[in-house]
Amino acid sequence: MKRIAFIDLGSNSVRFVIYEISKTGSYRLIYQEKESVRLSENMWGTHELTKEAMERSLRALKGFVHMANAMEVDTIKAVATAAVRLAKNGDAFIKAVKERTGLNLECIAGEEEARLGFLGVINTIGLKDFIIFDLGGASTEVTLVKNRHIVKAVSLPIGALTLTGTYQKGDEYTPKELEKMTKAVKKTIKEHTWLQNIKLPLLGIGGTARNIAKIDQRKLSYPITKLHNYELPYHRFHEILEDVKGKSLEARKKISGLSSDRADIIIAGLTIVDELFNYVNTKTLVVGGCGLREGLFYDYYGENYLGGNSIIDDILVHSAENVLLSMTKHELVHAKYITKLATTLYDALEPLHKADKNFRRCLIAAGLLHDIGKRVNYYSHARHGCYMLVNSNLYGISHVEQAFSAFLVMNSHGLTPKEYKIFLYGKLLDQEQRLLGQKLSIILAIAEALDESHEQFIKRLEVNIKYTSVVIKVFYLEGRDVSVTKTAVEKLSKSFKKEFKKTLEIEWHESRKEA
């Protein structure tokens, strides 16, 4: 077991995380803390970090080092970004950090900051072509991603804290100040013509992006509190922008979903996002909950556990298997076996359910994690599993797809009308998705029944779709007792006919082949 800590000292806040990596290579976040230190506050007249800002940061870092020692962390990796990078006294501050805390604080270049942010995103969100913006207090890193690789990146010298300090002279922006700031942001972005009219979705990381998602979720009474991979269209973002701009500081502090410690700088942050929307000419914003500090982790993990490859190929399977690695070997084998059977049936029955490949990935997620609820309680484990699936670090599928996967887990054990009413994530699914979910739930249930005894003795399935029936030939290892399995599958015949409008016929055949 190994514990690794990462510290991300930004211009507005400093974040501290601890990951635990097991001998099997599975990992989990075990601690996280954030302090608002505003390191870049009031530095733009002199281009020097102020004594007060440095002292706030040093106190926070000292506390994090104490926590790392208390939790027996093996290694600490600490990085600083734009504020330290641009300050005349940045080197002196790094020296003070070493003297006061013992930390070796590394000031990373804008390109490295963009790369680490990219790693945090690409290993946790399943987009291929998009534009990342990491909006911080003193800079905004913008990265063009195509086919899951960086094409171009730039560090823009505009951030929520520095723009506020430069253009807002009183408690509120005057119309003229707001106009000047907007023009400055527009001018800075337009210097990079490769962004113009590219029409790819924006993917935002950083506090401003997360607050946009929180505000929108509260307005919609969104059933999932997860911010990562949350998507909203431009018109809803623009409503938030206009609402925020029309309120005083005290009124902004009361906006549901907006952190009170960000209320004074949020207008500048939203202005940057708005101008990116306009210049890129896109209508979609995806919010990422994983950024630079997760990038630090994946950089380390790839180097030490993945043979130097820090970009994970299939993030859905990887993240699901990471959850599964906390299970016993027996549970892991069963979960993978169920998933294989379920996808075999899914492919064979495609003429009947007519679902696209995205729903196949949902079935994979549901199959791998179908028994995860048993870690809470065997009884009602489907309901527990539903909640855990939605709230686990499962990457590569959208919120709707995650809710759909959770529905499969819950419904595969029989979801009564009363239970469906309390299925919190049901409002994310439309009627067509719910009807499809009922069909795929039966497929998952049959796959579970086929390994009812957890012996993995079924070697092959052959499916024949007829006019009034579906015939499944089950080839199992010679000499095995299939009575329990037969009973479990037969119980699903009625549900199968209800959903697929055909009778289910199972033929059992002994197979002499072990492979």
Predicted segments with their positions:
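A short amphipathic beta-strand at an alpha->beta junction
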Residues: 500-515
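A short interface-forming secondary-structure element
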Residues: 472-487
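Acidic, divalent-metal-coordinating active-site segment for phosphoryl/phosphodiester hydrolysis
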Residues: 138-144
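Short, surface-exposed alpha-helical segments at coil->helix boundaries
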Residues: 87-94, 486, 490
